[in-house]
């Protein structure tokens, strides 16, 4: 077996294990935004929000006006973690044309991002040579979710998983925890992506099951 095939098998096994862990040991995170919070979101734009970087600095999204932005919640121990590679490639290919990528580690899904911010950064640079900005680990669902995510979810809710070999397994896992899971805008799993256009609108939401080529085409159309 070649090294490439070994890596493919490794990540496939990891995703299977992580989904099993989700079924056995995790619950669907609580509903995200109240009606009042959603009403507040309507009056805001993405440029009203700030984030904390992995090193503790402040990042004003207003500084990204006129850019196309890909925002993704990530984890280092997930079967979707190899998506770091095509995400980094997109950053290198399109950053000069106006693409920005914001990586927001999150430990809410199967506990798959347990490391410190420094450990997560070291993992990503060592295994995937990432160069795009990485934020401080944060929640994307529930009472402690980032205000940015309350806004993002108010703009684009969940529309279903894409055709994928793990689609039925994901759906069964969430249905077991909450029969109404598909009606809620919450982030469902690691590597959910939001694409922001140059005017600050949420152009698209992609679930982790989405083909990376489809995401790249969306980004290219906005540059």
Each language-model region and where it sits:
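Thiol-based oxidoreductase modules, predominantly thioredoxin-like and allied folds used
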Residues: 98-115, 131-142
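Bacterial N-terminal signal peptides that target proteins for export
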Residues: 2-11
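N-terminal "domain-start" segment that seeds a small globular fold
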Residues: 29-62, 82
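Conserved helix-turn-beta segment immediately C-terminal to the redox Cys motif
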Residues: 67-68, 76-77, 81-106, 124-128
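Non-catalytic, surface beta->alpha helical segment in thiol-disulfide oxidoreductase systems
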Residues: 203-223
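C-terminal motif of bacterial Sec signal peptides marking the signal peptidase cleavage site
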Residues: 20-23
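Thiol/selenol-based redox catalytic cores and closely related redox-interacting motifs
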Residues: 129-209
